[in-house]
Amino acid sequence: MKKDIHPDYHTIKVEMTDGTQFETRSTWGKEGEVLKLEIDPKSHAAWTGGKQKLMDKGRVSKFNKKFQNFRSEKKD
């Protein structure tokens, strides 16, 4: 096996949307950093049965905001 080709695998903390945290091992970030989730099983529509809230910074939201006043008028 080749040496020094694999990313560093270390312990990080993951913070859920309700503020609870747990430790796991990952290649994300650096040792001890906190990964804050925006969507998790406690808030995702697939697990809660509710409608999914689109993020304001999401691509669909940006598109809809940009073109909210645009209307296609049919010419005869």
Curated annotation (Swiss-Prot):
Kindly indicate whether the keyword Transcription belongs to this entry: no
- Which Gene Ontology cellular component terms are annotated? ribonucleoprotein complex; ribosome
What is one Gene Ontology biological process annotated in the Swiss-Prot or TrEMBL record?
A: translation
Q: Which Pfam families match?
A: Ribosomal_L31
Q: Name one GO molecular function term.
A: structural constituent of ribosome
**Description of how the protein assembles with itself and partners:** Part of the 50S ribosomal subunit.
User: What name appears for this protein in its UniProt entry?
Assistant: Large ribosomal subunit protein bL31
Which species? Pelagibacter ubique (strain HTCC1062)
Its taxonomic placement starts with: Bacteria, Pseudomonadati, Pseudomonadota, Alphaproteobacteria, Candidatus Pelagibacterales
